[in-house]
From Swiss-Prot:
The gene is infB. Residues 137-248, 266-314 are annotated as: Disordered. Residues 401-570 form the tr-type G domain. Residues 410-417 are annotated as: G1. This is Translation initiation factor IF-2. HAMAP family: IF_2_B. Residues 435-439 are annotated as: G2. Residues 510-513 are annotated as: G4. It comes from Xanthomonas campestris pv. campestris (strain 8004).
Length: 902
């Protein structure tokens, strides 16, 4: 390579980009302004050396040897013994200390010297450094030993102080016992000479007795000479002797135990048991009767009998009991420190029949707690709910304008969906079964005035909860009223929902293109519902539209946009999303699907979602056209996939950071809901049981299993069908759910003899097999009208027939004749209807029934006839009744069977 090698050429030779080579040259300390400058051989070698040092390689073997000479590593191993205290003994432990030190000679130090060191000088320098290091290690070990010694001395000093305090307390206690014994002993007995053994036996127990300190521990008072005494005196003397000997021997044994275990902070289990046995074992002779009698009345350790005596409470103990939403009777009794039977008795006195394992609600538990004299406080178990609330507060941000949410409400067949069809330029109503809406439809439409989100609600009476849910989450309600029909029941209900939700109302008078349209009639009828048009001086906008030809639709959109501007709708566009579930269903291919309306934040794919008692991760988002948007902002309805189950329509949803929090919140909510449901379903109160016993006689039960395509339809069907129940028949929905009819549904229906209702769903093969083998009544429906009508028919068939009595004729008794064959025969005039033979009759006297029986004989001109009509005279013989009088009325009636209906 020549002297005229440029940077560009050098880069080509080493196969390196020019920019990278310039950077490496700059890092090596050489500055070049461009790739066309010349690189000398010296600069090349300098660059090569820099690159070698950068990659950890020496430039030459000589340099590598010099690098190795700059570094020296010393290994050292040292063995020593350490003594460790282990309870009462000391243990010696061998400790091996290993040290490894590496010394590196710095370049500055080497460059500052005039000449390199000789091997002897290097060895002397290394030995000096080793000696200094060894001295530092010895100083460190000495410092640690002094620290350990000071710590041990502090511990021993603390033990001595504790032992001195114990001895001081023990001395004070013994002095107090001796003073108490002196106060309790009779003074004359202690001062007088002992004429018998009883006073002599009491003498050693006196604190003023002189021989007590010199008396040996094993001495017995029985060895003293004593005069004979009565048996009762001997017993008393034995008791007093035992008590006195106990005091002295216990003191000696306590002293021995104290000396044996003194100065030990931690004792083993065996030592603790031995110390307890020494302190607690009875004194006196082993097996003596006096010792056994003394042990039965009081503890053998007199030092513990005083301070630990039982004191009777002077006031009732009032406990503060924390009660959650529900609590079992056993748990409540444990918190009250009472027996479970006492709590059950208290509940029974309050009229609540509950077992010890049964759950009761918070109000009932609080009442029984107050009844038992304690205080009840509400337990706060909403830990995960608080964390969820904190997440929601963290998501607050800057608010921006959002599109309005408009709910279309009105009566059936007044053109709600058709009006929305025209706005969207699509055909929705033709796709609904029967031409009526049975789901909440959520759509967002981009108009020239901005984005508007529409909610289309059903108008049928069975979908009351759907309409209420739509009015709750909306900003503006558009009330559609047909100009030819006027105000109908569901129209009034929609007005009530809008007023209850506090949202503004816009009335769209539809079908004005029909011949019988009368918009003025609609305005007048809505006046009764306090909906006053602007023409009449009110604040409600009335827009005349035609969903068929499109008349007035633009005016309606202008009115919606104007109302939205007045409301100044704002929401947080970024951050965690939150909103409400509009509808939910179970798709066989996609799993649980929830239609949600985002109210705050932005909902994105991959977010963790908690929705009522369900949770999950958003796997996909779909709009009403089937497209998958990247995210959904405020006031935008979307379908969410990925939840753990089908949520309830109307549940709120919120996005959280992780799946763990979502799962914990969902499980806590499910537990609370299950406990509340158990408490609500249990018939606890006595009056409810008695009422059910009264109603149960003769009441028929129709069991149903309801499966539908969406959660809203399930809810509407349950409410509508259960409302058909009366005193004669009860509609019982044993199971309901979303999705197709499965094998478990068929088994439930077979076990309870229920009818299966499939609303827009079908049964699978296994379910159909069970239905056929068990003869289960399975019916498919797509219109809610047909469901209600057929359930009414089935329920009416269970009711059977009703026997009714119909009066067919009345005869007036004019005279009474006597017959040897029939007895009293009434001569009558038929004044109403017809009287027939062999029909039941009633005899009325002064409009009061005096006899009910059967017509035995009916004659006219001595001839038997089958019937006698109005205005004709006849003779009537009443079977088994001879007390007929003139002026009575004979009422002839017949019993007919009438089918009972709901």
């Amino acid at each position: 390579m020549s002297q005229q090698t440029t940077i560009r050429k050098l880069a080509e030779l080493v196969n390196t980009p020019v920019d990278k080579l310039l950077v490496q040259l700059a890092e090596a300390g050489m500055k070049f302004s461009g790739p066309d400058q010349v690189v000398t051989s010296t600069e090349k070698m300098k660059l090569l050396g820099f690159l070698r040092r950068t990659h950890g390689k020496a430039d030459t073997p000589a340099e590598a040897a010099s690098e190795a000479a700059k570094k020296i590593t010393l290994n050292r191993r040292k063995l020593q013994e350490v003594t460790v205290n282990a309870g009462r003994t000391k243990t010696t432990v061998n400790v091996e200390v290993r040290q490894k030190r590496t010394y590196v000679k710095s370049e500055n130090e080497g460059s500052g010297r005039a000449a390199p060191m000789t091997p002897d000088e290097e060895r002397a320098d290394i030995l000096a450094k080793l000696a200094a290091s060894r001295q530092r290690n010895l100083d460190e070990q000495q410092r640690l030993a002094e620290s350990d010694r000071a710590r041990d001395e502090a511990i021993q000093r603390k033990r001595d102080e504790e032992q001195a305090a114990k001895d001081r307390v023990e001395a004070e206690r013994k002095a107090a016992e001796e003073a108490a014994a002196a106060a309790s002993a009779p003074a004359p007995v202690a001062a007088a000479p002992a004429p018998s053994s009883a006073p002599a036996a009491r003498a050693p127990s006196s604190p003023s007795s002189a021989p007590r300190p010199a008396r040996p521990a094993g001495a017995s008072p029985a060895s003293r000479p004593a005069t004979p005494a009565r048996p009762d005196d001997r017993n008393n003397a034995a008791k007093h002797k035992t008590r006195g000997s106990h005091v002295m021997v216990a003191g000696v044994e306590d002293d021995d135990a104290t000396k044996r275990f003194a100065g030990q902070l931690h004792l083993s289990a065996a030592d603790r048991a031995r110390r307890s046995n020494v302190r607690g074992k009875p004194t006196g002779r082993p097996g003596s009767s006096s010792s056994r009698r003394n042990d039965g009345g009081r503890g053998s350790n007199q030092s513990n009998s005083g301070p630990h005596g039982f004191e009777r409470p002077t006031a009732p103990v009032v406990r503060e009991v924390a009660i959650g939403e529900t609590i079992t009777v056993a748990d409540l009794a444990q918190k009250l420190a009472l027996k479970g039977g006492d709590v059950v008795k208290a509940l029974f006195k309050m009229g609540v029949m509950a077992t010890i394992t049964q759950s009761i609600d918070h109000d009932t538990a609080a009442l029984v707690t107050e009844e038992l004299g304690h205080k009840a406080v509400r337990a706060d178990n909403a830990d995960f709910e608080d964390a969820l609330l904190a997440h929601a507060e963290d998501a607050q941000g800057e608010t921006t304008s959002r599109p309005p949410v408009v709910t279309i409400m009105g009566h059936v067949d007044h053109g709600k969906t058709s009006l929305l069809d025209y706005i969207r330029r699509t055909k929705i109503a033709s796709g609904e079964a029967g031409g009526i809406t049975q789901h909440i439809g959520a759509y967002h439409v981009e108009t020239g005035r901005g984005v508007i989100s529409f909610l289309d609600t059903p108008g049928h009476a069975a979908f009351t909860s759907m309409r209420a849910r739509g009015a709750k989450i909306t900003d503006i309600v558009v009330l559609v009223v047909a100009a030819d029909d006027g105000v109908m029941p569901q129209t009034k209900e929609a007005v009530a929902h809008a007023k209850a939700a506090g949202v503004p109302l816009i009335v769209a008078v539809n079908k004005i293109d029909k011949a019988g349209a009368d918009p003025l009639r609609v305005k007048n009828e809505l006046l009764a519902e306090n909906v006053v048009a602007e023409d009449f001086g009110g604040d409600t906008q009335f827009i005349e539209v035609s969903a068929k030809v499109g008349t007035g639709v633009d005016t309606l959109l202008d009115a919606i946009s104007l109302q939205a501007e007045v409301l100044e709708l704002k929401a947080v566009a970024d951050g965690r999303a939150s909103g409400t579930v509009i509808e939910s269903s179970l798709d066989k291919g996609r799993g649980p699907v929830a239609t949600v309306l985002v109210q705050q934040g932005a909902l994105k794919r991959g977010d963790y979602l908690v929705c009522g008692i369900q949770y999950g991760r958003v796997r996909a988002l779909f709009d009403e056209t089937g497209h998958q948007p990247a995210s959904a902002g405020p006031s935008i309805p979307v379908q969410v996939l990925g939840l753990s189950g089908v949520p309830e329509a109307g549940d709120d949803f919120v996005v959280v950071d992780d799946e763990r929090l979502a799962k914990d919140v969902a499980q806590q909510r499910e537990t609370k809901r299950r406990e509340s449901r158990l408490v609500a379903s249990a018939t606890n109160r006595m009056e409810d049981i008695l009422a059910q016993m009264g109603k149960g006689e003769g009441q028929q039960v129709l069991n149903l299993v309801i499966k539908a395509d969406v959660q809203g339809s399930v809810e509407a069907l349950k409410q509508s069908l259960v409302a058909l129940s009366n005193d004669d028949i009860r509609i019982n929905v044993i199971h309901s759910g979303v999705g197709g009819i499965t094998e478990s549904d068929a088994n439930s229906a077979a076990a309870s003899k229920a009818t299966i209702i499939g609303f827009n769903v079908r049964a699978d093969a296994s379910a159909r097999k069970i239905v056929e083998s068990n003869g289960i009544d399975l019916r498919y429906f797509s219109i809610i009208y047909d469901v209600i009508d057929q359930v009414k028919q089935v329920a009416s068939g269970l009711l059977g027939v009703e026997i009714r009595e119909e009066i067919i004729g009345i005869a007036q008794v004019r005279d009474v004749f006597r017959s040897s064959k029939f007895g009293a025969v009434a001569g009558c005039m038929i004044i109403e209807g017809v009287v027939k033979r062999s029909k039941p009759i009633r005899v009325l006297r002064d409009s009061v029934v005096v006899f009910e029986g059967e017509l035995e004989s009916l004659r006219r001109f001595k001839e038997n006839v089958d019937e006698v009509r109005n205005g004709t005279e006849c003779g009537i013989g009443v079977k088994a009744y001879n007390d007929v009088k003139a002026g009575d009325q004979i009422e002839c009636f017949e019993r007919i069977e009438v089918a009972r209906t709901l």
